[in-house]
């Protein structure tokens, strides 16, 4: 609440300038009719108010997938924290990354990690607000970051997550979407993008017996790198059940429309499994789908950290 009041106070003197800036951004956004429709579709799907700020925040999330985490975990963010506070904030950031790594196994864990991320982001923004050289542009960026975090929390309630993951080249965001089906079946979509490895997307279908999946990249070398881990992927994805995995290089890979769509643009409506299934069946389904997600994310993180380190040494 204090941060909201500080942001509101800082915005008072340049409200008209903010409006002009927002209008300019929306004018630019409207030039891409397809992207504009996607953004409004996502906002409507998750019952998020289509305010100007939310539209701009969603547009930024779609176009700059790692932007939120770069602002939170980047070392260049301005601030007025004292040295001891900087150390405390750095430890909190490390803890959030560790907690997210452990949290992927369950929706409850991811919800708790999301709350911790919001607390760290609030401390980052407080430091910017207190900075002697804070500008109106900084204020706008903070408003956008605050809106993005709020949107992320609302989407997480529908099992659509943005997960920060540490690699040797920095923190990147992994998008995870879980779509439940009947019984123990369902879909798991995972997408990400890094500077060194380009776009990576995976979709897994949990069937009655085993898992089928497609793992793709827009770069041939990354596709071959992922293919080299086929034995590891197959072994861990579904607790010993058969895994039928395929790999592809797709030059024009569109992460926003891969499988169900990174933000659920193309996803079918979630089935009302919580009411129709027994608690036992629901928990078994949850354990299975989130195990698939956790296993793939861990494998990819280990793979990218290793190759990033090799690239840095080269």
What residue ranges belong to the model's regions?
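Intrinsically disordered, low-complexity terminal tails
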Residues: 1-314
